Amino acid sequence: MEKIEKRTDYCGNITEKYIGQDVNLYGWVQRVRNLGNLVFIDLRDREGLVQIVVNKDSGKKLMDIADSLGNEYVVQVKGKVVKRSEVNPDMKTGQVEVDATEIIILNKAKNPPFEIKDGIEVSEQTRLKYRYLDLRRPEVQQAIILRSKILRATHEFFDENGFIDIETPILGKSSPEGARDYLVPSRIYPGSFYALPQSPQLFKQLLMGAGFDKYYQLARCFRDEDLRGDRQPEFTQIDMEMSFADEETIQSYTEGLLKKIMKDVKGIDLKTPIKRITWTDSMNKYGCDKPDTRYGMLIHDLSPIFKDSDFKVFSGAIADGGFVKGIAVKNGAKEYSRKKIDKKADFIKRFHAKGLAWVKFEDGEFSGPVARFLTDENKEALKKEFDLEGGELVVFVADKWKVCCDSLDHLRREFAKETGIIPKGVYDFVWVVDWPLFEYDEGLGRWVAAHHPFTMPDDEGVKLLTTEPHKAHARSYDIVMNGDEMGGGSIRIHKRSIQENMFKALGFTKKRAYEQFGYLMDALDMGFPPHAGLAIGLDRFAMMLADKDNIRDVSAFPKNASASEPMMHAPAPVADQQLADLGIEVEEKYQDSVKATEERLEKMAAEDAAENSTWDK
């Protein structure tokens, strides 16, 4: 039986303080270099690399073992730490090396399908299929460790501030609102299903009614929706709720949490209070409700300048109730040719813009397609509006308010990336407040809740719920960082009458409202306190702090872009008996696909066993 002796320290921590000491190390062989009389071994663990040295004076047995090592072998090394003759400044342990006296091979390794090092080019499918190997790479490990640091800081903050960590159920009831639920069939109640939670929203509100006052949870959530780079079917929320709290209270605690996380994880002193911007100002200045406030290039409403313009594209749009909005790109006059600008015009068509007008301002003169329509008054107004100094490209969109906002938001982000004005290593937070209670969903053709149907309207909004609900404003707030929504929250409805009016405004019938949420409305009649809360998306937050482009890079075992897991081959067909126990039968139109999947998985397993198994040896 292998005896595992106590490790002295991690490989990456063997620095000058250990010189002259005997150490016992464990790790993976990163590289072996045999120079004849000397063998150098780079030994790796989660903290980094240390160089192991074996020379001919160590004896033939040790030299033979060292020479037999392959990449990714798991070994135990004993030896003395000595000062290196040549320092390697690129390694944390570059001042020292370990003069080995014993090497024990704990396990051998086949040649991996890709090299275990940073900066390799390998497909995501291969990385996920061999995720246990991918996770050995330092940059991947550091992203997972960073996520762990966020979790630790979160637990510490909430514990220090009197919050109670309460787990809410994973198996709950389906609600057809929002994204699709993941359903779990019940064997005990055939034909009935649990739903995995999209959030613990109602449970945490009920906990406030139960008198717990301060709740938090690192909540696992599930949504069956189309995937993007920043989405996974399962994800984690930093979830909090408080009784007897207003917007400022929740925002203050959130800022305290963010301040601790930024300090503990990134070593950054976050300045608080975090600035606020209203939803309306955010839309008008940045074109979106997730403003990237790291740079300028703000959107300007130019409608007053062009309402009487001879350029009918502008004046006509304004006359039809639309707007003319624009942005100025510094040094854009030389950077962007007509061909490049035409590509931008094509780009914004996906946001329903009809076109892109533009002028350049150079050497005190305007040029470009729109320049001939500009009066002297227009020119002076534009120079003043944008504070033009020379060399700018000014682009315009004339359309409905929402189209102008969407188009210029995406253009602004594109121009910022291309012109290099986004500062590196900056984490800029902003609160977006004073949201509309409802937003119009073009696809559904009706008004829907801007956040969720349990959000409290402001005082005027409570009155508008029964008359003009689409004009109501919400007591809600989102926290945004670098143009990405980190989280959001609101004051919650705590009275039955307001909750019923909210459901009415959303088009619920009484029957539907009480079938889905009767328990909540009954609870609101049982002495429910005013309460509020917020949730932060841990995965997205970790992704941004780790400077990654994909949430999959900060999840240990993520799904791919098709919501499947190539290593375990999930999802996969199950045995007929399992389906029969649940009263489920696969429709005939899907049976060929299921059979093909079963055959493919069986073939892969058989090939794996034939090539690699020691079963019959």
Show which residues each predicted segment covers.
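Class II aminoacyl-tRNA synthetase catalytic cores and aaRS-like
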Residues: 1-617
